[in-house]
Amino acid sequence: MSSLLLFNDKSRALQADIVAVQSQVVYGSVGNSIAVPAIKQNGLNVFAVPTVLLSNTPHYDTFYGGAIPDEWFSGYLRALQERDALRQLRAVTTGYMGTASQIKILAEWLTALRKDHPDLLIMVDPVIGDIDSGIYVKPDLPEAYRQYLLPLAQGITPNIFELEILTGKNCRDLDSAIAAAKSLLSDTLKWVVITSASGNEENQEMQVVVVTADSVNVISHSRVKTDLKGTGDLFCAQLISGLLKGKALNDAVHRAGLRVLEVMRYTQQHESDELILPPLAEA
């Protein structure tokens, strides 16, 4: 193996702004397969760490793959430090996790990482399920999120169903959802962005609610009827990018929502079942 060693000058190492930890598909536009190109469109460097590697989402007639083994997963994280690729790291974002043990491994890595990066932004999308489908991850994942990742996160982006699971509270109206979100806030967890909150069905609107200790901001967007998958992953990619580019939280959330709508409409125009990213106009 030593005879193959070519690259040992760590001063030449590529540097990441963001490490994105979530699913990856060979075919399609979910998880890091949509998040990475979206983040790169924003001019940021991102390293993708897969939690599951799948042929495609389960919404097709064939489906292959599964969770990354713990040994591989921990090795992927460790290798980023061994390559000295995290000197300029600014954020870690997480999405779909394959197993509870991955969540524990990730939390241990993040805890160690924060010693060298005390200002690191950790944003967790606690992917658990939704109102229509119920829980679609392994049953021990919600508790793993509560125990290991939520205490480390500065911000989280649950949907209404996930907020209910994490808090044990009914969140089917706006006031109860806000109260549940506020119950999660702590010295570390500064904000909760509730995605897919109740909106005005008659006016074809959906709401995203930004909850902090000091404020609540309800952002309404047009509702697009579609079965497209990966919109939540795209939203989080745009949100973390906006925050790192200096946007205030409410502005970053608003812009992320607008970008998701733009991508959905563009995809529909091109008659695709998988998200297609149009060029990003500078704002």
Swiss-Prot record:
<feature type="binding site">
    <location>
        <position position="59"/>
    </location>
    <ligand>
        <name>substrate</name>
    </ligand>
</feature>
<keyword id="KW-0067">ATP-binding</keyword>
<dbReference type="InterPro" id="IPR029056">
    <property type="entry name" value="Ribokinase-like"/>
</dbReference>
<keyword id="KW-0418">Kinase</keyword>
<dbReference type="InterPro" id="IPR023479">
    <property type="entry name" value="PdxK"/>
</dbReference>
<comment type="subunit">
    <text>Homodimer.</text>
</comment>
<feature type="binding site">
    <location>
        <position position="23"/>
    </location>
    <ligand>
        <name>substrate</name>
    </ligand>
</feature>
<keyword id="KW-0460">Magnesium</keyword>
<dbReference type="GO" id="GO:0009443">
    <property type="term" value="P:pyridoxal 5'-phosphate salvage"/>
</dbReference>
<comment type="pathway">
    <text>Cofactor metabolism; pyridoxal 5'-phosphate salvage; pyridoxal 5'-phosphate from pyridoxal: step 1/1.</text>
</comment>
<feature type="binding site">
    <location>
        <position position="162"/>
    </location>
    <ligand>
        <name>ATP</name>
    </ligand>
</feature>
<dbReference type="GO" id="GO:0008478">
    <property type="term" value="F:pyridoxal kinase activity"/>
</dbReference>
<keyword id="KW-0547">Nucleotide-binding</keyword>
<feature type="binding site">
    <location>
        <position position="136"/>
    </location>
    <ligand>
        <name>Mg(2+)</name>
    </ligand>
</feature>
<dbReference type="GO" id="GO:0005524">
    <property type="term" value="F:ATP binding"/>
</dbReference>
<comment type="similarity">
    <text>Belongs to the pyridoxine kinase family. PdxK subfamily.</text>
</comment>
<feature type="binding site">
    <location>
        <position position="125"/>
    </location>
    <ligand>
        <name>ATP</name>
    </ligand>
</feature>
<keyword id="KW-0479">Metal-binding</keyword>
<feature type="binding site">
    <location>
        <position position="157"/>
    </location>
    <ligand>
        <name>ATP</name>
    </ligand>
</feature>
<dbReference type="GO" id="GO:0000287">
    <property type="term" value="F:magnesium ion binding"/>
</dbReference>
<dbReference type="Pfam" id="PF08543">
    <property type="entry name" value="Phos_pyr_kin"/>
</dbReference>
<dbReference type="InterPro" id="IPR004625">
    <property type="entry name" value="PyrdxlKinase"/>
</dbReference>
<dbReference type="InterPro" id="IPR013749">
    <property type="entry name" value="PM/HMP-P_kinase-1"/>
</dbReference>
<dbReference type="GO" id="GO:0005829">
    <property type="term" value="C:cytosol"/>
</dbReference>
<comment type="function">
    <text>B6-vitamer kinase involved in the salvage pathway of pyridoxal 5'-phosphate (PLP). Catalyzes the phosphorylation of pyridoxine (PN), pyridoxal (PL), and pyridoxamine (PM), forming their respective 5'-phosphorylated esters, i.e. PNP, PLP and PMP.</text>
</comment>
<keyword id="KW-0862">Zinc</keyword>
<feature type="binding site">
    <location>
        <position position="162"/>
    </location>
    <ligand>
        <name>Mg(2+)</name>
    </ligand>
</feature>
<dbReference type="GO" id="GO:0008902">
    <property type="term" value="F:hydroxymethylpyrimidine kinase activity"/>
</dbReference>
<keyword id="KW-0808">Transferase</keyword>
<feature type="binding site">
    <location>
        <begin position="221"/>
        <end position="224"/>
    </location>
    <ligand>
        <name>ATP</name>
    </ligand>
</feature>
<feature type="binding site">
    <location>
        <position position="231"/>
    </location>
    <ligand>
        <name>ATP</name>
    </ligand>
</feature>
<protein>
    <recommendedName>
        <fullName>Pyridoxine/pyridoxal/pyridoxamine kinase</fullName>
        <ecNumber>2.7.1.35</ecNumber>
    </recommendedName>
</protein>
<feature type="binding site">
    <location>
        <position position="233"/>
    </location>
    <ligand>
        <name>substrate</name>
    </ligand>
</feature>
<comment type="pathway">
    <text>Cofactor metabolism; pyridoxal 5'-phosphate salvage; pyridoxine 5'-phosphate from pyridoxine: step 1/1.</text>
</comment>
<feature type="binding site">
    <location>
        <position position="195"/>
    </location>
    <ligand>
        <name>ATP</name>
    </ligand>
</feature>
<dbReference type="GO" id="GO:0008270">
    <property type="term" value="F:zinc ion binding"/>
</dbReference>
